[in-house]
Amino acid sequence: MLKMQHSRQSDQGRVLTMVWTPLGFKKHRGKTLPQVIFADPDWFFYMYENRRFKSGHAVEAEEIYKRATSIKIRQDGKEELVADYFRNPVTDRFYGISIGPQSSPRPECRRSFLYRTDVIDLSVPRRFADYDKSGYSALIGTLKNHFYGSTSYKMTKGRCEAFFDDDSKFVFEQKV
């Protein structure tokens, strides 16, 4: 079985090696978890929540979960950017996010506005529905547009893994 490796600095200054191991599951056979989170995040979060990943994949899933729920919003200008999260008031499902300046007023559509935060959290759609492909499609599209300039940006295996390998894209908890 082919294994993909990458290294990164730990908070103690050591280099950690993460191995992205291709999955053996039928649905995503041959894909690594970084690929799955971009292609089918609903499936990933279901598997994670139900502790379906075993051994090495469980370690990788824990790392992906931490990162997928704390994606740092890229700051391009003078003003700090934040994410506004919305739900569909009719279906009560996740609707999407909008990334904009923190100084902008909160949206007027209070019935659909959920909250504002400084990170992108890919787990949010599952809080509204166990199966929400349209909510995830909107969220992943916004993420790709924010980082790559297009909702249709092709996320190859290398690009998916590079995204999750880049510590600068995530907000990590501070240890006191």
What name fits each language-model region?
Residues 1-176:
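Accessory DNA-engaging acidic/polar modules
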